[in-house]
């Protein structure tokens, strides 16, 4: 069984945890449907930059 030689310092612990944070995504409102969505992603209804996406049409059938 692995056993540590010494207790990690507060600095080492902080450096390890420096990447453990929650990212808040930038939100946008679609111009046509007035729907809130993550920026640079399609809305739930399939719109991106005010246009219906082709990919959404194929997946919804």
Curated annotation (Swiss-Prot):
NCBIfam families the UniProt entry points to: rpmF_bact
- Biased segments, Basic residues type: 7-19
Question: Where does the source fall among the domains of life?
Answer: Bacteria
Molecular function in Gene Ontology: structural constituent of ribosome
Task: Name any one Pfam family assigned in the record.
Answer: Ribosomal_L32p
One GO biological-process annotation of the entry reads:
translation
Q: Which PANTHER family match?
A: 50S RIBOSOMAL PROTEIN L32, LARGE RIBOSOMAL SUBUNIT PROTEIN BL32
- Show the taxonomic lineage: Bacteria, Pseudomonadati, Pseudomonadota, Gammaproteobacteria, Enterobacterales
Annotated spans, Disordered? 1-20
Q: Name one GO cellular component term.
A: large ribosomal subunit
> Which SUPFAM superfamilies does this chain map to?
Zn-binding ribosomal proteins (SSF57829)
Q: Which UniProt keywords apply?
A: Ribonucleoprotein, Ribosomal protein
InterPro entries given for it?
Ribosomal_bL32, Ribosomal_bL32_bact, Ribosomal_zn-bd
Q: Is Ribonucleoprotein included in the keywords of this UniProt record?
A: yes
Q: What is this protein called?
A: Large ribosomal subunit protein bL32
UniProt record similarity statement: Belongs to the bacterial ribosomal protein bL32 family.
């Amino acid at each position: 069984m692995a056993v540590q030689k010494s207790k990690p310092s507060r600095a080492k612990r902080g450096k390890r945890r420096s990447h453990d944070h929650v990212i808040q995504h930038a939100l946008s409102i679609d111009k046509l449907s007035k729907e809130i969505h993550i920026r640079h992603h399609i809305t739930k209804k399939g719109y991106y930059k005010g246009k219906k996406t082709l990919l959404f049409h194929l997946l919804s059938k």
